[in-house]
C-alpha cells in the first residue's frame, strides 16, 4: 500500500511550500475538488523510487470560527487518513499555544508523528530544535522548506518506517530484460499477474461504481467483505471470467447488494489515489446523464500522470434519448481529447448492457502497456517518422534523432537519442507519440517519450602526440617563423 503522509500545523508555517517541493517530481495534483477536498489538497510524490501520497491541510490555531473551524476539522480528518504525520512548526516564531495543542492531539491519537522545525535558515539549528524538544514527539527534524535544506534527512526518517512492498516492481522493471534483435515483441509477466490483472474501478461519487462492481462479480453474489484495517483500506476481490484471472480493487466501500441502490457512496481521495497506484488497468466510470464535469477531468488527469492503462465507461446510458446521447458524444470528443487513446464504452451497470465488452478493452490495454519491442523495431519506426516529417531547424541546424529503445513498461517509455533534443517542440513529440501508437497498435495506455542528447566521447580529452609528432611540429613552427621573418626583411 502506498504510504499517506499528512502535513499539519498552524497557518503560515510552510506546509504548502513543503507540499509543492515534495510533489514537484510528479505534477499530478488532485486538489480543490468542489465539495470533497475543499480544504485538503492531495498530491503524489516520489523519492528514491518510492511513491507516497502527501496531504496538505489548512492551518489549525485553536480559536477557529466559521470557515476556519471547517478548515481545522478537515485538518484533523487528514490526520485520521494518514499513515504518518509531519507536524510543522515555525522556528522563527518559536513555540506557541497552538503548537502545544496540536502536539497534544497527536500524542492522544497515538499517530506516528514527526516534529518538523521549519524556516531554520539563518538560525542556530540546535537552538531551534531544542526549543521544541519538550513537546515529546521525538527528536525534531530541522528543515528550510523554501530552500530544500534538510528535506533528504526528513524523508529518510519518515519513509524509513514503511516497509517496501516486495510485490511492487520498480518503475521500468518490466523492461530490464532486453528483447534481442530479430525477436518478436513479447510480454513479460509482472509479479502481480499471479493474481490476474489488477483492475481499479474509479469515478466520482454516485456514478454507479458500486453497481458495476457487483455486476462484474455476478448478481447472485452478496458482497460482505469486511476486512480489518483503517477506513482507507480498499477491498481486493479476486475473480475469473473466461478463464482469465482478475483482482478487482474496490474503493466504493463495504456494502450489501440490497442496499447499493439507495446508499450514497462515500468518496475518499486517498482510496482513489492508492487504487490507481496499485492497479494495472483503471476503469473510469462516468455518469452519462451528467456528461463530462471538471471533477472527472481532475481524476482523469491523475490517471494519465500515473501512467496506468485506461478504459472509460459511460454509465446510465440506457435512460437517455438520442438527442442527449449525441450531445454527450460530442462533449466526450471535445473535452477528453487528452485521453483519446482509451476505449469508451456506453453501458448500463444496473441492467448489464455493455458491461461484458469492458473485458476485451481491459485485456487489450493491459497487453499494450506491458509488451516490449526490440531496439531495431523502435529505431525503424523512428527513422520512418523522421523521413515522413523531419524535425524543425534550430539556429539553422536540423535536430537529429538517431535511434530509439524501450526504457520501461506500464506505461511504455521510449527513449530517443539524438542531437539538440532539448529543442524538440512539444508538437513534434506528440507526432512521434501518435506514430509509435499507430504502428505498434497500442490501445488504452499512455505512451511516454524521453530524449537523451548525444555525448562526444572525446570531449575534454587532449590529443596526445608521439615524440616524433612533437619534433615534427617544432620543426614546422621553426620553419614558419623563419619564413615569416624573411618576408618582413624583404618589405624593409
From Swiss-Prot:
Domain (KH-like): residue spans on this chain: 371-455
Annotated GTP 2 binding sites: 203-210, 250-254, 315-318
SUPFAM superfamilies, alphabetized: P-loop containing nucleoside triphosphate hydrolases
Biased composition (Basic and acidic residues): 461-470
Positions that bind GTP 1: 9-16, 56-60, 118-121
GO biological-process terms attached to the record: ribosome biogenesis
Composition-biased stretches (Acidic residues): 168-181
Composition-biased stretches (Basic residues): 471-492
Gene3D superfamilies: 3.30.300.20, P-loop containing nucleotide triphosphate hydrolases
Protein name, entry field: GTPase Der
Species of origin: Ectopseudomonas mendocina (strain ymp) (Pseudomonas mendocina)
Amino acid at each position: 500500500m502506498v504510504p499517506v503522509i499528512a502535513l499539519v500545523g498552524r497557518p503560515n508555517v510552510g506546509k504548502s511550500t513543503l507540499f509543492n517541493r515534495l510533489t514537484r517530481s510528479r505534477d499530478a495534483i488532485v486538489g480543490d475538488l468542489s465539495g470533497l477536498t475543499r480544504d485538503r489538497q492531495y498530491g503524489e510524490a516520489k523519492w528514491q523510487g518510492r511513491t507516497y501520497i502527501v496531504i496538505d491541510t489548512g492551518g489549525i490555531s485553536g480559536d477557529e470560527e466559521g470557515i476556519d473551524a471547517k478548515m481545522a476539522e478537515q485538518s484533523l480528518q487528514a490526520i485520521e487518513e494518514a499513515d504518518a504525520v509531519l507536524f510543522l512548526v515555525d522556528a522563527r516564531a518559536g513555540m506557541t499555544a497552538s503548537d502545544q495543542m496540536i502536539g497534544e492531539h497527536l500524542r492522544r491519537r497515538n499517530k506516528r508523528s514527526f516534529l518538523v522545525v521549519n524556516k531554520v535558515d539563518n538560525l542556530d539549528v540546535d537552538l531551534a530544535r531544542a526549543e521544541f524538544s519538550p513537546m515529546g514527539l521525538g527528536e525534531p527534524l530541522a528543515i528550510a522548506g523554501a530552500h530544500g535544506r534538510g528535506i533528504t534527512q526528513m524523508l529518510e526518517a519518515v519513509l524509513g518506517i514503511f516497509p517496501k512492498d516486495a510485490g511492487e516492481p520498480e518503475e521500468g522493471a518490466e523492461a530490464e530484460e532486453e528483447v534481442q534483435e530479430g525477436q518478436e515483441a513479447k510480454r513479460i509477466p509482472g509479479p502481480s499477474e499471479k493474481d490476474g490483472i489488477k483492475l481499479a474501478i474509479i469515478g466520482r461519487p454516485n456514478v454507479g461504481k458500486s453497481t458495476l462492481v457487483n455486476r462484474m462479480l455476478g448478481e447472485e453474489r452478496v458482497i460482505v467483505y469486511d476486512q480489518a484495517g483503517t477506513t482507507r483500506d480498499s477491498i481486493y476481490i479476486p475473480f475469473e471470467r473466461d478463464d482469465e484471472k482478475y483482482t478487482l480493487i474496490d474503493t466504493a466501500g463495504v456494502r450489501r447488494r440490497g442496499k447499493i441502490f439507495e446508499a450514497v457512496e462515500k468518496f475518499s481521495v486517498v482510496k482513489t489515489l492508492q487504487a490507481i497506484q496499485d492497479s494495472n488497468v483503471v476503469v473510469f466510470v462516468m455518469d452519462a446523464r451528467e456528461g463530462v464535469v471538471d471533477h472527472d477531468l481532475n481524476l482523469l488527469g491523475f490517471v494519465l500522470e500515473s501512467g496506468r492503462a485506461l478504459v472509460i465507461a459511460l454509465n446510465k446510458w440506457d435512460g437517455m434519448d438520442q438527442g442527449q446521447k449525441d450531445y454527450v458524444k460530442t462533449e466526450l470528443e471535445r473535452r477528453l481529447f487528452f485521453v483519446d487513446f482509451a476505449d469508451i464504452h456506453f453501458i448500463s451497470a444496473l441492467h448489464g448492457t455493455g458491461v461484458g465488452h469492458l473485458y476485451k478493452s481491459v485485456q487489450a490495454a493491459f497487453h499494450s502497456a506491458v509488451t516490449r519491442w526490440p531496439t531495431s523495431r523502435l529505431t525503424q519506426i523512428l527513422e520512418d517518422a523522421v523521413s515522413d516529417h523531419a524535425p524543425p531547424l534550430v539556429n539553422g541546424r536540423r535536430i537529429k534523432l538517431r535511434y530509439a529503445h524501450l526504457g520501461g513498461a506500464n506505461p511504455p517509455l521510449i527513449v530517443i537519442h539524438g542531437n539538440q533534443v532539448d529543442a524538440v517542440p512539444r508538437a513534434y513529440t506528440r507526432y512521434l507519440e501518435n506514430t509509435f501508437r499507430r504502428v505498434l497498435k497500442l490501445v488504452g495506455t499512455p505512451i511516454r517519450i524521453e530524449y537523451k542528447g548525444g555525448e562526444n566521447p572525446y570531449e575534454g580529452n587532449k590529443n596526445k602526440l608521439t615524440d616524433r609528432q612533437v619534433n615534427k611540429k617544432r620543426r614546422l613552427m621553426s620553419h614558419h617563423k623563419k619564413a615569416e621573418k624573411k618576408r618582413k626583411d624583404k618589405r624593409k
